């Protein structure tokens, strides 16, 4: 072995990287060139100056050879391969130096020789350093190889207990590219993708991927629990369950939360604690960090912000970081877009104009009578916005609209706001002049004229549905006007057309009003027309016909109260407003003022009403109905309204002789069935006094009273109209009813235990109507039942 080669190996192992490369280039270039006198002289001068004997150099060579042999024994095959690669790289570098010009070689060699003189101080010290430095690189390389070594070369314990090296994961899954060491592990993994479960339980047909899972499951059927707790004696199928149970006795809590450092005895409880307590907290922290600009990019920081991410594996951590970065970017973009939208579309009104949930800002239209006022808020120099008055509509209330506090002068006084009227749902009836004024103004809705007005309300209803039904019927009248006739509801005289009066009373009177509303000077209806006064709109007739057809068989109960053995009833029917008109008068007036087709329609309507009355009067089902009960006890019962709906009921007293046995009544018993009825509304509900048995004991006591009543009725009724006796009332009643739609003139009233039978009378003020004298009383017509013989009506 040449000295140059020995020196090369020595410098390679003892010197630094720069020194090794420089010394090697110097020696090789000096030996190969042979022509440069400078390098040879320098080497001779170095050897002479140091005066090193030849024997010492040989001894050093032997030491180097021994060290190289030891190094070869200690260095593994991989390290030797690395060493050979470094030598090859050095040779390539030497070839590049050989290709350099000669002048540059001298420049490179001169300073390098000086460094060699400095490094070589003593041979013994150098040998000691050589031994230490030979050991250190081997240990460092072993440590580095342990970290960088693949798991395929780690010693493991095989299934049979023998030691062996891990083979590389050559078995790759086709579905997810996962690598496995053996084909068994690969096949077990493929079962997850295919869903195949080859191991089946013989008792419950459950299937499993692995055999040990099947064996563990079979212990459930056999009841075998091989693992037992030493303290409490509980048994478990799995050993893991037993160990987890033992921690409840010992109080051991090996699992710690990495956020709050709290300890837990089970892993599932740790996961639940993290999920409930720390996940939302981490999200909030990340949002705050994004807002404050504390988070930087992954390339600059090089670490994750949350400790939870550090505990994850590297691949999962990278996936979560990518997802979180993508979500952060998307959230930042969404927030920026929202901010831009908010800036682009600023609200017209400030936040103070917002109202509670119960209110909403309704659509409004503001009339600007003056141009200066209309453009003042648009041309304001200060830039402030003054919105107009808004109409607030309460959603929960039923169509109670609040009007603006300040009204323009051009709006009619009909739309003025009165809170008390709106709260009571008062739907007022205005006069004709107010309606004419409102029709002239096209900006005002016609419904407002019906809802509010300056005149006093005739009646106000607390039932909103009834009021709205009245409003719908009023709209039929307005729709039929067609700019040719005006309809007005007035408080005044009685209408000249009785049939029209009856229909209008049925459509106007509210359902919640009692029967006492039909008194003198109550609501009267006058329908005025420019061309024809005897025509009822088709819509009103249609609604009345529909109402009769749907409610023909309806029936309402009437409550009566009795006190001190006197029959006390709350029925008070004063039908002075419903006149009686003979068929000749009705037909004559209709033929003079209306055409033949409309008269036929009215006659058909009257026939329909007559049929409805016949159905109610001849219905035998009313005989056993407990709708009328007269109780003659000494108890004082509270007076209740007799009829819940006066305008939509028909009060008809069925045969007067039909009181049941055991009754002591002052009324007359007649062999024939006399019908007595009063039509007030557009319905035909009857309230009969019915019974097939007669009381012969009470006939003698009431005969005098009935004779007196009949005689007085004949004396008063003959000067004006034809009188109908109670015994012969049925047949003459039908003939005048076919031609007229008026109510029956005769009135039946029971009040405070007294029975009043009033015949048709005359009046100076209303000579054409027989039922005006309402308040007159006749002492001879009143009678009260005997206290000793009073019984309960059937």
Swiss-Prot record:
Phosphoserine modifications at: 51, 250, 301, 306, 412, 665, 784
Keyword vocabulary terms for this entry: Acetylation, DNA-binding, Isopeptide bond, Metal-binding, Nucleus, Phosphoprotein, Repeat, Repressor, Transcription, Transcription regulation, Ubl conjugation, Zinc, Zinc-finger
Keyword Ribonucleoprotein listed: no
Region (Disordered): 298-336, 574-599
Main location, first listed in the record: nucleus
Residues joined by cross-link Glycyl lysine isopeptide (Lys-Gly) (interchain with G-Cter in SUMO2): 6, 88, 115, 132, 291, 308, 356, 402, 421, 424
Span of the signal peptide: none
Top-level division of the source organism's lineage: Eukaryota
Pfam family, one: zf-C2H2
Family the entry assigns: Belongs to the krueppel C2H2-type zinc-finger protein family.
Name of the featured protein: Zinc finger protein 148
């Amino acid at each position: 072995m040449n000295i140059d080669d020995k020196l090369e190996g020595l410098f390679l192992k003892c010197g630094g990287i720069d020194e090794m490369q420089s010394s090697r280039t110097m020696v090789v270039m000096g030996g190969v060139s042979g022509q440069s006198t400078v390098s040879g002289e320098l080497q001779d001068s170095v050897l002479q100056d140091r005066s090193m004997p030849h024997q010492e150099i040989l001894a050093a060579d032997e030491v180097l050879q021994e060290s190289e042999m030891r190094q070869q024994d200690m260095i593994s095959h991989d390290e030797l391969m690395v060493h050979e690669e470094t030598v090859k790289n050095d040779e390539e570098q030497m070839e590049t130096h050989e290709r350099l010009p000669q002048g540059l070689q001298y420049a490179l060699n001169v300073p390098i020789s000086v460094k060699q003189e400095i490094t070589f101080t003593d041979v013994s010290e150098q040998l000691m350093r050589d031994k230490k430095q030979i050991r250190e690189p081997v240990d460092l390389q072993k440590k580095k190889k342990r970290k960088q070594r693949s798991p395929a070369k780690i010693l493991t314990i095989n299934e049979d207990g023998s030691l062996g090296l891990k083979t590389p994961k050559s078995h790759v899954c086709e579905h997810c590219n996962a690598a496995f060491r053996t084909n068994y592990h690969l096949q077990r993994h493929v079962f997850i993708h295919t869903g195949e479960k080859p191991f089946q339980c013989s008792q419950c047909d459950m299937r499993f991927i692995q055999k040990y899972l099947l064996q563990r499951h079979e212990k459930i059927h056999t009841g075998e629990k091989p693992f037992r707790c030493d303290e409490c004696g509980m048994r478990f199928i799995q050993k893991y369950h037993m160990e987890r149970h033992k921690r409840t006795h010992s109080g051991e809590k090996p699992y710690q939360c990495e956020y709050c450092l709290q300890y837990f005895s089970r892993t599932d409880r740790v996961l639940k604690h993290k999920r409930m307590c720390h996940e939302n907290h981490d999200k909030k922290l990340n949002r705050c960090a994004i807002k404050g600009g504390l988070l930087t990019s992954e390339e600059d920081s090089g670490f994750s912000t949350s400790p939870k991410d550090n505990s994850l594996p590297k691949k999962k951590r990278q996936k979560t970081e990518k997802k979180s970065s993508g979500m952060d970017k998307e959230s930042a973009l969404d927030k920026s877009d929202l901010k831009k939208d908010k800036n682009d579309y600023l609200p017209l009104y400030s936040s103070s104009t917002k109202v509670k949930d119960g209110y909403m800002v309704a659509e409004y239209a503001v009339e600007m009578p003056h141009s200066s006022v209309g453009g003042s808020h648009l041309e304001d120099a200060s830039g402030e916005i003054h919105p107009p008055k808004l109409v607030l509509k309460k959603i929960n209330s039923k169509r109670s609209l609040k009007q603006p506090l300040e009204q323009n002068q051009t709006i009619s006084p009909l739309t003025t706001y009165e809170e008390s009227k709106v709260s009571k749902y008062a739907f007022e009836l205005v006069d004709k002049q107010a309606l004419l004024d409102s029709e002239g103004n096209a900006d005002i809705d016609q419904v407002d004229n019906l809802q509010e007005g300056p005149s006093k309300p005739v009646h106000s209803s607390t039932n909103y549905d009834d009021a709205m039904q009245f409003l719908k019927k009023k709209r039929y009248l307005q729709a039929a006007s067609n700019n040719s006739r005006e309809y007005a509801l007035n408080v005044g005289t009685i209408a000249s057309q009785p049939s029209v009066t009856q229909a209008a009373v049925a459509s106007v009177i509210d359902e919640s009003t009692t029967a006492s509303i039909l008194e003198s000077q109550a609501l009267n209806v006058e329908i005025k027309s420019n061309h024809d006064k005897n025509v009822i709109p088709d819509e009103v007739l249609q609604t009345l016909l529909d109402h009769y057809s749907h409610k023909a068989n309806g029936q309402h109960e009437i409550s009566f109260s009795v006190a001190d053995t006197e029959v006390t009833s709350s029925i008070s029917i004063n039908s002075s407003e419903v006149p009686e008109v003979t068929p000749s008068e009705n037909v004559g007036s209709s033929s003079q003022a209306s055409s033949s087709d409309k008269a036929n329609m009215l006659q058909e309507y009257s026939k329909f009403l007559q049929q409805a009355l016949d159905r109610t009067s001849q219905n035998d089902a009313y005989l056993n109905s407990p709708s009328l009960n007269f109780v003659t006890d000494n108890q004082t019962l509270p007076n209740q309204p007799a009829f819940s709906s006066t305008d939509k009921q028909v009060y008809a007293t069925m045969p007067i002789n039909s009181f049941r046995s055991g009754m002591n009544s002052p009324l007359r018993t007649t062999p024939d069935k006399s019908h007595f009825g009063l039509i007030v509304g557009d319905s035909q509900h009857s309230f009969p006094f019915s019974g097939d048995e007669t009381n012969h004991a009470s006939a003698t006591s009431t005969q005098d009273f009935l004779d007196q009543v009949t005689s007085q009725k004949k004396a008063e009724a003959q000067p004006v109209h034809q009188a109908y006796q109670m015994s012969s009332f049925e047949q003459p009643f039908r003939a005048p009813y076919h031609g007229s739609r008026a109510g029956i003139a005769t009135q039946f009233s029971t009040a405070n235990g007294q029975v009043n039978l009033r015949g048709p009378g005359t009046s100076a003020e209303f000579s054409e109507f027989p039922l005006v004298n309402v308040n007159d009383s006749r002492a001879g017509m009143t009678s009260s039942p005997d206290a000793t013989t009073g019984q309960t009506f059937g």
